[in-house]
């Protein structure tokens, strides 16, 4: 994106948190306070975009429809990455953490394409919000086959997905219903 944009390497040390601990969430790009969520009992060490279990998450923005951004959502795409890295031991677990967080606390970013990988598998997950009137997000995640590679291109890449292949394709329960209600499909 920019030769000067990523001039630092973040570090979140592993920690054990007391029951009832809250985590304050700040928008990754602006630093604006967006809300708080319950902290996980244990969080993992994260340096940059990889954690101690070799889970890594990268992203590329494709924007999407402006009317689907929910400014009231607590979780933005950058916070989503680092919270998921602190809470996940595998790529699949990271997908579950990410989608559960936005479902419960709302998603306040535009369209994002995430690459989520661990030593055993890699996934592409694309996510858009549901707009100001709905909390949550619509998303699809497809496993990258072992004999393939993938690259980010600042645009959505998932054009079709196999609804019946639960081993290699995950998606929000309302992905088709939402698209039909909005007149997109």
Predicted region positions:
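A contiguous strand-loop segment
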Residues: 1-76, 97-185
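Second-shell loop/turn segments in exported
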Residues: 67-71, 79-88
